[in-house]
């Protein structure tokens, strides 16, 4: 059992995202960057799940009978495409306002998604297991990364996959994700990111390995200002994604 007197929730982060929850499904709003690079990360997730679970990548519903957990799901930007691909999806977020928005949008699109207002540590203590866990752009917002990874790892089935996307702790990431995105371009509200919470890939790999998770792939996701697009890259200096497998 995980000690729930300890928490992964950072109240200031929770308050911040609660204030802007109504913006989740506005592609030109405060979550514009997520909408922009969502297709890139979705393509990667689909490709790797099909490869590791031996699914037909051209099938309309390749994730049929797979159970997916999206932690820190926000308004459901990842949950909805996972459900459309056939997965049984559970989306959790500590912010009730985010879950409210996600539920309404799913209902409007006739999608069956199990949304819950809870934390990783509380859910882990319920004993539920998943084939795939998505920790996308969330570890840089939690209060205790080690506790968070420990809790999420406990919910992963043997040979299950965990996708973890976050920001590297480099001056380049500080300049792009904070100074550029928040203060100059104003893509994101000021205060969205805290540089001290950014993680170097080796640090994140260490947290994963301590919890019986082996990194089997890694990519960077970079922005091209010439065509206003996001693409996979070997450059992990700013945004990066690790794919880990449970032993």
From Swiss-Prot:
Please tell me where S-adenosyl-L-methionine binds in this chain.
Answer: 41, 72, 93, 136
Catalysed reactions, as listed in the record: a 3-demethylubiquinol + S-adenosyl-L-methionine = a ubiquinol + S-adenosyl-L-homocysteine + H(+); a 3-(all-trans-polyprenyl)benzene-1,2-diol + S-adenosyl-L-methionine = a 2-methoxy-6-(all-trans-polyprenyl)phenol + S-adenosyl-L-homocysteine + H(+)
Under the heading Pfam families, the entry gives: Methyltransf_23
Q: Which GO terms describe its biological process?
A: methylation
* Gene Ontology molecular function terms on file: 2-polyprenyl-6-hydroxyphenol methylase activity; 3-demethylubiquinol 3-O-methyltransferase activity; polyprenyldihydroxybenzoate methyltransferase activity
Kindly give the PANTHER family that the UniProt entry links to this protein. Answer: METHYLTRANSFERASE, UBIQUINONE BIOSYNTHESIS O-METHYLTRANSFERASE, MITOCHONDRIAL
Q: Which HAMAP family match?
A: UbiG
The identity of this protein, by name, is Ubiquinone biosynthesis O-methyltransferase
Q: Which organism is it from?
A: Bartonella tribocorum (strain CIP 105476 / IBS 506)
Upper lineage is: Bacteria, Pseudomonadati, Pseudomonadota, Alphaproteobacteria, Hyphomicrobiales
Q: Which gene encodes it?
A: ubiG
């Amino acid at each position: 059992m995980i000690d729930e007197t300890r928490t992964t929730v950072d109240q200031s982060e929770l308050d911040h995202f609660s204030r802007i929850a109504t913006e989740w499904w506005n592609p030109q709003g405060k979550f514009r960057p997520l909408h922009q690079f969502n297709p890139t990360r979705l393509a990667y997730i689909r490709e790797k799940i099909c490869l590791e679970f031996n699914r037909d990548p051209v099938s309309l519903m390749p994730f049929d009978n797979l159970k997916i957990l999206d932690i820190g799901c926000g308004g459901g930007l990842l949950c909805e495409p996972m459900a459309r691909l056939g997965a049984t999806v559970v989306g959790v977020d500590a912010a009730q306002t985010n879950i409210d928005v996600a539920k309404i949008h799913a209902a409007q699109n006739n999608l069956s998604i199990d949304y819950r207002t809870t934390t990783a540590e509380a859910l882990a203590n319920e004993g539920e297991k998943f084939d795939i866990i998505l920790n996308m752009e969330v570890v840089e917002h939690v209060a205790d990364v080690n506790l968070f990874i420990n809790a999420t790892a406990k919910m992963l089935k043997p040979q299950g996959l965990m996708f973890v996307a976050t920001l590297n702790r480099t001056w380049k990431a500080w300049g792009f994700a904070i100074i550029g995105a928040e203060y100059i371009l104003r893509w994101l509200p000021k205060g969205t990111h805290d540089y001290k919470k950014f993680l170097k890939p080796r640090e994140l790999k260490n947290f994963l390995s301590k919890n019986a998770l082996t990194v089997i792939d890694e990519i960077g996701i970079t922005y091209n200002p010439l065509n206003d697009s996001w693409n996979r890259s070997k450059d992990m200096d700013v945004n990066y994604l690790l794919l880990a497998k449970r032993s």
